[in-house]
């Protein structure tokens, strides 16, 4: 694929140009770059696509030159949510780059799985079976292959899935609805069974997530407690996904587990960073902001960066702002100051 052309921006709208300048600028505060990214994501995800959609995808991809692993991994996540084939080549390039940060490569693999295009299977299968690759890459590619196969299967068309409160394209769908809905203990058993394929365990994870939303659902606390047990799993990839789900749920019952995870200096950076951002989404819960501030000078860069973003998110939660972006996630995008 050709690299993002920085010189061919003729005809790109002022909104996209302004957001692009922010997201690629290493001198901009990280929190502001994240807000610009989520604004570009809104444009990149438009269905049907608008004249801003491809330029927004290219603007997101242009920021892969950043030094921030945290930002780059979020770029990959956002491209995976676009349902747009124009994002595939950018993500494949990131995944193939052995010099790229592992967390970013993992997110690119997961994003290719979310997009669901079969032309990504070749690279994903090759890396899944490459013993020279880090475990997190092999595991992510394994799940991504299973998701793409599922996405394009006849079995998927026959499945009935419970409607979800969440619009995200997840690494795996929730468990299908059978004659009787699986109980939380049954889902927990699948979630924690390390002998099962990761894709199947992820399906249990997202089924539990959907039983924990909205937070006043009678099953919510029990489902959160079941998910929390997944934070003790031997797989760092699995633990990080549990923390991500907690960030989606914003359930106060997850705060103790997330705090323990963030506080564990022996925990993998990709897990601690996800715990930090999940706590940021719970910023209106008493004590969370003070917990986050304790890690502003953490030895690990990705954790420090996550704390900056998490505190910005916490401030956003406390202020009751409508959208964590420089333009809204719904309605017509507005211009922003450069």
Swiss-Prot record:
Q: What EC number(s) would the UniProt record show?
A: 1.14.99.29
Looking at the keywords, is Oxidoreductase present? yes
The principal localisation class reads: cytoplasm
Query: What Pfam families does the record tag this protein with?
Result: HEAT_2
Its function? Catalyzes the hydroxylation of the N(6)-(4-aminobutyl)-L-lysine intermediate to form hypusine, an essential post-translational modification only found in mature eIF-5A factor.
Q: Which positions does UniProt annotate for Fe cation 2 binding?
A: 240-241, 273-274
Cofactor binding, per record:
Binds 2 Fe(2+) ions per subunit.
Q: Reaction catalysed by this chain?
A: [eIF5A protein]-deoxyhypusine + AH2 + O2 = [eIF5A protein]-hypusine + A + H2O
SUPFAM superfamilies assigned:
ARM repeat
Pathway involvement of the protein, from the record: Protein modification; eIF5A hypusination
Family statement drawn from the similarity comment of this UniProt entry: Belongs to the deoxyhypusine hydroxylase family.
Its recorded name reads: Deoxyhypusine hydroxylase
Q: Where does Fe cation 1 bind?
A: 73-74, 106-107
The domain of life is Eukaryota
Provide this UniProt record's keywords sorted from A to Z: Cytoplasm, Hypusine biosynthesis, Iron, Metal-binding, Monooxygenase, Nucleus, Oxidoreductase, Repeat
Q: Which compartment or compartments is the protein found in? A: Cytoplasm; Nucleus
Q: Where do the HEAT-like PBS-type repeats start and stop?
A: 71-97, 104-130, 200-233, 238-264, 271-298
From the UniProt record, which GO molecular function terms apply? Answer: deoxyhypusine monooxygenase activity; metal ion binding
Which cofactors are named for this entry? Fe(2+)
Its GO CC terms are: cytoplasm; nucleus
């Amino acid at each position: 694929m050709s690299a993002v052309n920085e010189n061919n921006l003729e005809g790109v709208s002022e909104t996209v140009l302004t957001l692009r300048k922010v997201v690629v600028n290493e001198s901009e505060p990280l929190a502001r770059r994240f807000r610009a990214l989520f604004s570009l994501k809104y444009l990149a995800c438009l269905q049907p696509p608008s004249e801003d959609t491809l330029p927004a995808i290219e603007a997101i991809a242009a920021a892969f030159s950043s030094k921030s692993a945290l930002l780059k991994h979020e770029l990959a996540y956002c491209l995976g949510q676009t349902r747009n084939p124009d994002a595939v080549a950018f993500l494949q390039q990131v995944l193939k780059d052995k010099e790229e940060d592992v967390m970013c490569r993992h997110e690119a693999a997961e994003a290719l799985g979310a997009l669901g295009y079969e032309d990504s299977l070749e690279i994903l299968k090759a890396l899944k079976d490459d013993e020279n690759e880090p475990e997190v890459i092999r595991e992510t590619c394994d799940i991504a292959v299973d998701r793409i196969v599922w996405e394009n299967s006849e079995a998927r068309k026959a499945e009935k899935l419970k409607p979800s409160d969440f619009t995200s394209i997840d690494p795996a769908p929730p468990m299908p609805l059978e004659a009787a809905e699986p109980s939380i203990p049954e889902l927990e058993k699948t979630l924690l069974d390390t002998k099962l394929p990761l894709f199947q365990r992820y399906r249990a994870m997202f089924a539990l997530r959907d039983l924990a939303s909205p937070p006043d659902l009678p099953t919510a606390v029990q489902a959160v407690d079941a998910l929390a047990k997944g934070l003790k799993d031997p797989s760092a990839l699995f633990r990080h996904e549990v923390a991500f789900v907690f960030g989606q749920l914003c359930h106060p019952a997850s705060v103790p587990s997330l705090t323990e995870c963030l506080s564990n200096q022996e925990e993998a950076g990709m897990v601690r960073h996800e715990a930090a951002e999940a706590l940021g989404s719970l910023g209106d819960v008493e004590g969370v902001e003070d917990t986050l501030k304790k890690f502003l000078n953490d030895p690990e860069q990705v954790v420090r960066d996550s704390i900056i973003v998490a505190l910005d998110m916490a401030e956003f939660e406390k202020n009751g702002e409508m959208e964590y972006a420089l333009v809204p996630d719904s309605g017509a995008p507005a211009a922003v100051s450069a």
